[in-house]
């Protein structure tokens, strides 16, 4: 696919909205969410906002939503889990190895849950509004066939 240059600006806008929403949900004073739940709601909001933009520019909603999710990938949790795994394999002390194993499981499960929440959260709006996301590219296909 060859998306227009406007897609970059829209993706950046959606990424800022999603990341800001996730930050707000994790740090609000009335209620606080864990990173996986907040990432799910942020991904749903990105997916919902991508559908009107897709209709306006005649591109698939995934062109906007997938790049917008990239800043929310939990790289630090993934790095800490791999670091704990390598330290676990290198240590000889039993208490340290237990601590590294717990760190690996905690950071690894957090990474997996956040990634799962991002994928499901971005896919839910596309499945719910399948007709709207499908018709966003229909006009473009008709124009290509006529030309």
Map each language-model feature to its residues:
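C-terminal transmembrane helix-loop-helix hairpin of multi-pass membrane proteins
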Residues: 53, 57-147
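Transmembrane alpha-helices that form the ion-translocation and gating core
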Residues: 24-27, 33, 37-60
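Short juxtamembrane and helix-loop transition motifs at transmembrane-helix boundaries
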Residues: 1-5, 20-33, 101-103
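Membrane-proximal intracellular helices of multi-pass ion channels
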Residues: 2-16, 20, 135-147
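Alpha-helical transmembrane segments of multi-pass membrane proteins, especially transporters
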Residues: 7-19, 35-47, 63-72, 76, ...
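Membrane-helix interface "capping/anchor" motifs
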Residues: 1-10, 55-63
């Amino acid at each position: 696919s060859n998306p227009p240059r406007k897609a970059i600006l829209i993706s950046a806008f959606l990424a800022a909205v999603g990341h800001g929403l996730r930050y707000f949900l994790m740090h609000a004073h009335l209620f606080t969410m864990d990173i996986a739940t907040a990432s799910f709601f942020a991904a749903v909001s990105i997916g919902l906002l991508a559908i009107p933009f897709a209709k306006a520019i005649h591109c698939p909603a995934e062109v906007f939503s997938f790049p917008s999710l990239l800043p929310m990938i939990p790289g630090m949790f993934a790095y800490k889990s791999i670091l704990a795994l390598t330290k676990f394999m290198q240590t000889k002390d039993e208490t340290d190895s237990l601590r590294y194993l717990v760190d690996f499981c905690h950071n690894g499960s957090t990474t997996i849950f956040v990634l799962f929440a991002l994928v499901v959260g971005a896919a839910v709006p596309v499945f719910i509004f399948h007709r709207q996301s499908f018709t966003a590219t229909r006009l473009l296909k008709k124009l290509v066939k006529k030309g």
